[in-house]
């Protein structure tokens, strides 16, 4: 997690004038409206003069301008100059290398980054300023980042900024290019920031590294009714999930009907939360994915939910149920394509049976009563002595409570990242960090209520669509010796004490064990 004080996208003209294209200020600066309203305000606001002077000083001291061919040929003595390459597993494969300058002060670390080499040039798609065709953005902008201390590692910070740069480049040159002429550059950049804020402001990267999707509490009654209306209006709906997103970070609220495979469900959730943040309330859109056929993306653990080719092609659609600032409530539906009314009716009856219980909510669905939901609220326990991430590595779901104090948030996220990166499988770690908090990481295995067939003969194989088959002619004989065993789920517990006053190791271990014993894993994470 990076606590950002200033994040600016600006351009420096050859005559040294700093033009602010867009700026974000955190609430630490007393600005409850982190975005401005118009391009003119961003360019002429007197309160930004101090920040513009800092950027101009950066450009002036180090010769960093649009005319600079190789900034790294000059090595300033009172700053750090860094060249790095994106990791091989980085999703931003176009990012070959980038140039970055950074300076440390007493309270913040300042970073200035120029367009990465290997990225597409922006001049191929000039951005209109204030809807004026004569005033175009012909100069490549720069990104200026001011980060509150303590700061993460240089590689983490530079990679984050470079990733934002690549997203900014893709943003202007790809799927929103058609909208550039309809909106001002400020509106475009503001939308881009909303969709990629989570890498800077949230701890989402840690959850992604664990390959889990966090779940959340229940929906309010009006939203449940609204979701019912959406399902009833969409003929052929076979299943759905509801996401709550804040700054592009998704949390799963409920999952209904035909189950998606965990890896695809998580991928779809992160994809939609980042790419459909622009939807307004009651707006919908089709989700276009390259994976075909879609039927291979669904779970086959329940035999009565098997899909056949007779029910038609599957399609995905997303709805925005509610919008507020950078928060969205999104509903994703998977439904039948072009089919007859009888097929739609049969699929609707067979597949929309009930809702998967997620988080601390249990929903009951009855087709005869118009899909009315009942909510059972979570009963408070004695688990409030820890912040925690409890992840089911088998199902890809996690319960997250990480509302850290603002002053210690980055400190705690940094330790959590290091702990997860250095851990080994089946490990149990407990440490007391410098500010007095206890952090524990444990992994445990449990047997679920789901059973699968297994056999002792190692020559037999198991496939999702068929039971065990013998490599030979004695498959029927070996099938007699098969038996059912429960599915083993691996859970990762990451616990952080809410107080820094615990001194006894024995007392801390006892509290951790009590937390694990009292934490209810069902139905939150098994489904």
From Swiss-Prot:
GO terms for biological process: macroautophagy; protein targeting to vacuolar membrane. GO terms for cellular component: cytosol; nucleus. This is Uncharacterized protein C1805.10. The lineage of its organism: Eukaryota, Fungi, Dikarya, Ascomycota, Taphrinomycotina.
């Amino acid at each position: 997690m990076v606590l950002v004080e200033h994040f600016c996208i600006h351009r420096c003209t050859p005559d040294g004038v700093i033009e602010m294209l867009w700026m974000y200020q955190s609430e630490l600066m007393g600005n409850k409206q982190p975005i401005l309203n118009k391009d003119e305000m961003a360019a002429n606001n007197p309160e930004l003069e101090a920040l513009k002077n800092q950027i101009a000083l950066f450009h002036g001291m180090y010769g960093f301008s649009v005319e600079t061919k190789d900034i790294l040929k000059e090595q300033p003595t009172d700053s750090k100059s860094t060249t790095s390459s994106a990791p091989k597993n980085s999703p931003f494969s176009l990012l070959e290398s980038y140039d970055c300058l950074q300076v440390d002060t007493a309270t913040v670390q300042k970073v200035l980054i120029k367009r990465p080499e290997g990225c597409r040039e922006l001049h191929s798609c000039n951005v209109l300023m204030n809807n004026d065709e004569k005033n175009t953005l012909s100069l490549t902008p720069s990104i200026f980042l001011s980060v509150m201390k303590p700061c993460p590692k240089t590689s983490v910070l530079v990679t984050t900024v470079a990733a934002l740069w690549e997203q900014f480049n893709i943003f202007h040159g790809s799927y929103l290019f058609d909208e550039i002429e309809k909106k001002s550059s400020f509106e475009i950049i503001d939308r881009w920031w909303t969709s990629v804020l989570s890498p800077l402001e949230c701890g989402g990267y840690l959850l992604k590294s664990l390959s889990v999707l966090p779940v959340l509490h229940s929906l309010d009654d009006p939203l449940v009714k609204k979701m019912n209306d959406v399902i009833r209006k969409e003929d052929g709906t076979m299943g759905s999930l509801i996401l709550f997103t804040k700054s592009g970070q998704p949390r799963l609220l409920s999952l209904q009907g035909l189950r998606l495979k965990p890896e695809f469900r998580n991928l779809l959730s992160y994809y939609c939360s980042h790419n459909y943040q622009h939807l307004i309330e009651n707006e919908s859109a089709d989700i276009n994915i390259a994976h075909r056929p879609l039927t291979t993306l669904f779970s086959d653990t329940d035999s009565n939910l098997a899909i056949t080719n007779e029910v038609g092609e599957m399609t995905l659609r997303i709805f925005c149920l509610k919008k507020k600032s950078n928060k969205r409530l999104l509903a994703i539906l998977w439904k039948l394509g072009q089919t007859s009314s009888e097929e739609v009716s049969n699929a609707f009856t067979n597949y929309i049976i009930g809702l998967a219980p997620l988080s601390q909510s249990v929903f009951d669905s009855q087709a005869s009563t118009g899909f009315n939901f009942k909510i059972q609220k979570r009963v408070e326990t004695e688990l409030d002595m820890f912040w925690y991430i409890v992840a089911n590595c088998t199902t890809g779901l996690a319960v997250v409570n990480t509302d850290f104090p603002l002053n210690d948030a980055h400190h705690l996220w940094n330790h959590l990242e290091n702990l997860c990166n250095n851990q080994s499988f089946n490990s149990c770690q407990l440490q007391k960090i410098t500010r007095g908090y206890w952090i524990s990481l444990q992994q445990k295995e449990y047997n679920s209520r789901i059973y699968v067939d297994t056999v002792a003969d190692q020559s037999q194989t198991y496939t999702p669509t068929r039971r065990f088959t013998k490599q030979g002619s004695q498959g029927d004989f070996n099938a007699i010796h098969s038996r059912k065993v429960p599915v083993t789920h691996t859970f990762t517990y990451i616990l952080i004490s809410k107080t820094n006053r615990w001194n006894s190791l024995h007392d801390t271990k006892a509290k951790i064990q009590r937390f694990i014993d009292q934490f209810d894993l069902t139905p939150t994470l098994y489904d």
